[in-house]
């Protein structure tokens, strides 16, 4: 079993890297959002994107789905990158991600989706927000970010993943 690093980039953005492949969640590297009312404590510079194969977006708020950062990633990488988004009936986000030149996969709610040899994720939506449970080898992580889960959703997650490690 290979070693996997989880690194906080900033805000809700973090990277999971096994040394060969990386996935980044909710990338927002620089700039302001919400009519210039929010900014990062420190803008992110010099991120190694060479192993980036996947981007996962939790929801459509600009501090999680930051279009300028997606454009930056596309302009500064040569590899094929798959963007993973929660399933939505409205396909605007999927269509715009594809227009940027990314591949895009929608994952169905409450079902585990195998990303690669070391990672699988499941999404648990609440309205426009989503929590992700991800499994790295034999460890279970919950990324709730700003998603408020109902009691029933917590029970569903607990039933599917009896032991959350982190």
Where is each model-derived feature located?
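Conserved beta-strand hairpin/beta-sheet module of binuclear metal-dependent hydrolase folds
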Residues: 2-45, 129-146
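Pre-active-site segment of Zn-dependent metallo-hydrolases
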Residues: 20-55, 60, 67-72, 149-162
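A short helix->loop->beta-strand "cap" motif at the edges of active sites that frequently abuts
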Residues: 21, 76-82, 102
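Active-site environment of divalent metal-dependent phosphoester hydrolases
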Residues: 31-32, 60-65, 90-93, 111-114, ...
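Short, surface-exposed connector motifs at secondary-structure boundaries
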Residues: 52, 73-81, 135-140
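Metal-dependent catalytic neighborhoods of phosphoester/phosphodiester hydrolases
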Residues: 66-76, 92-99
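Active-site-proximal loop/helix segments of hydrolase catalytic cores
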Residues: 68, 125-166
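Metallo-beta-lactamase
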Residues: 85-139
């Amino acid at each position: 079993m290979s070693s996997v690093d989880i690194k906080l980039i900033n805000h809700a953005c973090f990277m999971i890297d096994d040394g060969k492949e990386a996935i980044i969640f909710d990338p927002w590297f620089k700039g302001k959002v919400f009519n210039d009312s929010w900014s990062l404590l420190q803008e992110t510079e010099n991120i190694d994107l060479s192993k980036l194969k996947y981007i996962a977006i939790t929801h459509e708020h600009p501090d999680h789905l930051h279009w300028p950062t997606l454009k930056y990633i596309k302009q500064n990488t040569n590899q094929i990158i798959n963007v993973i988004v929660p399933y939505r009936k409205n396909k605007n986000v999927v269509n715009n991600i594809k227009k940027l030149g990314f591949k895009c996969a929608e994952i169905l709610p409450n079902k585990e989706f195998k990303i690669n040899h070391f990672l699988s994720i499941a999404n648990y939506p609440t309205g426009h927000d989503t929590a992700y449970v991800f499994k790295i080898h034999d460890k279970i992580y919950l990324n709730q970010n700003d998603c408020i889960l109902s009691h029933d959703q917590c029970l569903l997650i607990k039933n599917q993943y009896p032991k959350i490690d982190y």
